[in-house]
């Protein structure tokens, strides 16, 4: 039997009239739908059971045949086939048109496909199709020309003159006849010859025509099929009609549109039978043409057909388009069974891989499993009985439910699903109530809080789905974020606060200086009240023999606090003792200074290093570092345990600490009043100078803003110096649990300057703080900023979501396809430094997790640090940086040779697992999510670099990222040099308000004009290279690629993307930006086709271009030449090889029109196109190499036991046998 789900590709084409008839199960002749009294479909109508199949399963319309046993019989009385009613979703009908009509997509699209084939302008076409003019089809021996347009009067005149010696017609029939006459081969040859001489607009049009004629020739579609003689009628269940209460009917708009077509068609038939006058027939034909236009794409031409309440009717095109269309609503995202949603609540007692599911919800979700188990155990006699027990919620079902949910993970998802960590698997635990329970550490990945957030739950049903959920999606595996490889499960709030308080030290606490032989002894002393968590004590290192204490310290006494001793009990036994929050202590034994020297008194040691302990409680960032380090050393299982222990410890310690906030905890500032008085004095001074005309209004404004900003900074400085380890607010802020210095300043100092609705700053600051309370005016001023903040956030979310969608669409088919593409190319990695922003990304960051492409040697000694083809880990990268190496050749995604994807060696390490990436990993989607997800954290504004002459508006944040990936002309564009050379002179031309920079190259000299106000970025005598900036600003990648090469442009885009993210505090891995940059530069534009069959100016994939050239070179011809072509992500997503993916993205009708004319073949390589047609996606476990592995079971018992040598000989013999066959 054929596997319906196994096909290589999917093709689209134009349907010929005969093809439409072959799909059809019968002609729809009447506009009737269903009989309003009997509610039965009318005969020959739009819902006819004879055409479309029975409305009831296995029952004909008249009731003569009922039941499965009559399957396949056609009733002799009513003519309905006995089969399932499901066929009403599949069977099509057709309408035989009395006159041909054009298909609006091919006539009205831009460019008009019919117009190009016939070489007639769209305006003229419209006149002919809608019966405003005649077109000459065959001029005969008259003086007329073919395709000449004649008005009614001219036609009569010519007819009187020449009689029947020429043929001219109107309407779609004329267009059909002309299209039939087109000889594609002849036209293509003629056009190719013409192209040699044509220039400008004519050449562009000729290339367009050639492209479309070539498409028809190669696809096997005939041009006349763009004119329809029959209209297909889609299955009735896809355009349903349902009865509402009160006897009225709700129907799909398509039925109304079909009825219009049928009515007009029937009227036209009648008029033709009656031999009505030509004018009346023409009018009816025009109305039929308009009815079919409205059916296919209502509103494309003229005013749309409206239904009740002046609402435009939804045509077939509208059914496909947009978010509510068939593609995005029903094919890419479906509603699924075995799912639920509820409010979430926190549950600190859960393990990291667990979630709480309310009992009633679990019972409903796992109902079939519970029913089966009830029957299996004999608690219920059959399934019906089991269902009844569940509905009644009998006592004996709960044990069965507990048993059933063991080993069956569920998926939890929170919208918006910004990245793959927004869906994770958990093992369900039954909980009372109605809320889903979530582990506190899972919140970060979901960006969830418990102020009313809701989450959806899904049950994986098949064994494969369960296995994937457990092995790949379980929350315990998602410790690192794919964005940059850092832990995403960093503790927050109470957990941070508790562990910070636990690891604090205090001089002079009870029991200070006590020495304990083992940690257990210290615990007894704590329980007896002899010591406190913050007490500094001594402990014998010998009590923890598995730890690495460093040379000679195995039997020493070390100084620590009891709290830190307890904290260290969370770590594995063989991990270092962490006594101070430093990177050194995480990677090597504790510093020597904490050990007692022989004979040294512990009190002396405390006097010496006590302050070091006091100054170093463990903050939030350090807790994250410990998770990272434990993950690197011990992997998933142990890290998951550590996280749960850390959570328990944090909650327990913050409970014991009893930290709370009161008004009294907000400190008073001593200097604020004096600082404010001084600022007011300075403001008065500035105003005075302005009144005397010594300052412009802008200078006055800027000065006042600066005075108040300085004042607020001084107040903030005083508050920042307030570090009281006993003050709860201070402890919360310093530990990283909640709040930052700015919040603290607003509580205790002053709020400072506020923004106006336009984004400027008010000159009057808010002097009060929240402890004192604001005046009415101050409160009013604050509201502008608050509202603007809310609006900005809402806008940013939408912008960022749309960016993510475009990124995913362009990168979704980038999958790791092979182990090594074998390229010897790579990129030179060096630190990314910006003139203004300083260091953007260090060399170390760029090396970790990448493969070397050349051997790396020490610049001083010349010894090999790392050989070629090695995956660099943190230690190796640090070693390279420490050796003083400035540049390293690495394998890169930008230079990978794998087609339709990337190889493992060019990608390097998978950031989410810290291992080398696996074949099948969907790295494109991950890259798109990693760039899109932090989009909401970037700013939305275009900053104006204040008052500097010549400084343009520089775009930053989200708009800048969009500008780069969409390849738009950047704001504040920099002029770049097109030659290598020296800056000869810089001159100002005051008369023309210009400056001129002369660059002297080796071959020619170039003069660049720049604005008079711009400040040149070069000086006379500077040596510069192609692509270097002459004035500050953003380089346009399209210009850069013309003067340099693809790789330089890609590296520029990469550096700029990193600048946008890292300056906003978002660490993004290079490889994600590389994946998308590669996608934007996948195409080339053909300059000279040589002896290939490519068209000049055609834009095509680099891989396809190489293949076409290879074929020509092999046969000894002249290859084509092309230049790199940069496409924005939207364009690139629409230009993809998959028409399904492009059509479901944007401009659905345009994509489908083009694809059908070209007879496009979708190779189904990406993810979206496979989701659309319901196939398993070709990534991850859906990769053919994983799917096609069939576990072999040897059923035959061996006659005797073979040795290895026997087996090898047997296999050799079998191979020879098959070869001889």
UniProtKB/Swiss-Prot annotation:
Cofactor (UniProt): Mg(2+); Zn(2+)
Binding site for Zn(2+) 2: 821, 896, 903, 906
UniProt keyword list: DNA-directed RNA polymerase, Magnesium, Metal-binding, Nucleotidyltransferase, Transcription, Transferase, Zinc
Gene Ontology cellular component list: DNA-directed RNA polymerase complex
Ligand binding (Mg(2+)): 449, 451, 453
Pfam family of the protein (one): RNA_pol_Rpb1_3
Catalysed conversion reaction: RNA(n) + a ribonucleoside 5'-triphosphate = RNA(n+1) + diphosphate
Domain of life: Bacteria
GO terms of biological process kind: DNA-templated transcription
EC number, as in UniProt: 2.7.7.6
GO molecular function: DNA binding; DNA-directed RNA polymerase activity; magnesium ion binding; zinc ion binding
Cysteine-cysteine disulfides: none
Quaternary assembly: The RNAP catalytic core consists of 2 alpha, 1 beta, 1 beta' and 1 omega subunit. When a sigma factor is associated with the core the holoenzyme is formed, which can initiate transcription.
Family: Belongs to the RNA polymerase beta' chain family.
Protein name per the record: DNA-directed RNA polymerase subunit beta'
Gene of this entry: rpoC
